[in-house]
Swiss-Prot record:
This is 4-hydroxy-tetrahydrodipicolinate reductase. The active site is at H158 (proton donor/acceptor), K162 (proton donor). GO terms for biological process: diaminopimelate biosynthetic process; lysine biosynthetic process via diaminopimelate. Its EC number is 1.17.1.8. The lineage of its organism: Bacteria, Pseudomonadati, Pseudomonadota, Gammaproteobacteria, Alteromonadales. Pfam families: DapB_C, DapB_N. SUPFAM superfamilies: Glyceraldehyde-3-phosphate dehydrogenase-like, C-terminal domain, NAD(P)-binding Rossmann-fold domains. It catalyses: (S)-2,3,4,5-tetrahydrodipicolinate + NAD(+) + H2O = (2S,4S)-4-hydroxy-2,3,4,5-tetrahydrodipicolinate + NADH + H(+); (S)-2,3,4,5-tetrahydrodipicolinate + NADP(+) + H2O = (2S,4S)-4-hydroxy-2,3,4,5-tetrahydrodipicolinate + NADPH + H(+). (S)-2,3,4,5-tetrahydrodipicolinate binds at H159, G168, T169. It comes from Shewanella sp. (strain W3-18-1). Catalyzes the conversion of 4-hydroxy-tetrahydrodipicolinate (HTPA) to tetrahydrodipicolinate. The gene is dapB. Pathway: Amino-acid biosynthesis; L-lysine biosynthesis via DAP pathway; (S)-tetrahydrodipicolinate from L-aspartate: step 4/4. NAD(+) binds at G11, A12, G13, G14, R15, M16, E37, G101, T102, T103, A125, P126, N127, M128. InterPro entries: DapB_C, DapB_N, DapB_N_CS, DHDPR_bac, NAD(P)-bd_dom_sf.
């Protein structure tokens, strides 16, 4: 896309929201059009750029998207499942594209998102990082070659404030591996182990979760056999990698027809 894409960021005062504001500031083809916080927040009325540490941007944090209807083309949302559904409904009614980085949606909410996406273009991904999306492609290859005869474990770690577990990225890793092997993740996933569990079933995919300190995000898939194991690992050291991916998705999604897309499509990996 040749011109600038105007973005609005909801949850602007959170850790990820501030990083998104900073990312928008540094990208030539992105213009921050609006920044939104919840009603009653002490941050309402503050300049978004000053909040994010990039200097004054003359974009004042507001408490409703209704005040910014004409100020943006794409809404970027890394908030919470219930809030993201409300924001997507708003985008459909106001003909705005949306980028969703929120994780933790239940099945009913995923069905809602699919229905809304029939009316407006939406990019939704549990992880916007280029490296993570490449990792998912590598997992397909590893599962094709080694998946049938190895024990598969997925280990993920995040900061102490993360609310959902396992992470959306870890679940996507499991889905990619299970699909490649012709398995149903809901039936073969094992989430943590305790007590006398008996011998491991090779058809299962194990998940282990770490929540500690300020870990940004670490994910490892292990394919373990007798005598050797393959580990595919991605480590994020800054939230900026997710924010930059979201900006890339925003530039891409404004040119798409209504539909539900993922970062694999944004990056041309599928």
């Amino acid at each position: 896309m040749g011109g600038q894409v105007r973005v609005a960021i909801v949850g602007a005062g959170g850790r990820m929201g501030r990083t998104l504001i900073e990312a928008a500031y540094h990208q030539e083809h992105i213009l921050l059009g609006a920044a939104i916080e919840r009603a009653g927040s002490s941050l309402v009325g503050i300049d978004a750029g000053e909040l994010a540490g990039v200097g004054k941007l003359n974009v004042i944090i507001m408490d409703s998207l209704d005040y910014a209807t004409d100020d943006f083309d794409v809404l970027i949302d890394f908030t919470a499942p219930d809030a993201s559904i409300v924001h997507l409904d708003w985008c459909v009614r106001h003909k705005k594209a949306m980028v969703i980085g929120t994780t933790g949606f239940n099945q009913a909410q995923k069905i809602q998102i699919n229905a809304f996406a029939e009316q407006t273009p939406v990019v939704m991904a549990p992880n916007m990082s280029v490296g993570v999306n490449l990792m998912w492609k590598l997992l397909e290859l590893a599962a094709e070659v080694m998946g049938d005869y190895t024990d598969i474990e997925i280990i993920e770690g995040h900061h102490r404030h993360k609310k959902d577990a396992p992470s959306g990225t870890a679940l996507k890793m499991g889905e990619v591996i299970a699909k490649t092997l012709g398995r149903d993740l809901e039936k073969c996933a094992v989430y943590g182990r305790e007590g006398i569990t008996g011998e491991r079933d090779r058809e299962t995919i194990g998940f282990a979760t770490i929540r500690a300190g300020d870990l940004v995000g670490e994910h490892t898939a292990m394919f373990a056999d007798i005598g050797e194991r393959l580990e595919i690992t991605h480590k994020a050291s800054s939230r900026m990698t997710f924010a930059n991916g979201a900006m890339r998705a925003a530039r891409w999604v404004v040119e798409q027809k209504p539909g539900l897309y993922d970062m694999q499509q944004v990056l041309g990996l599928n």
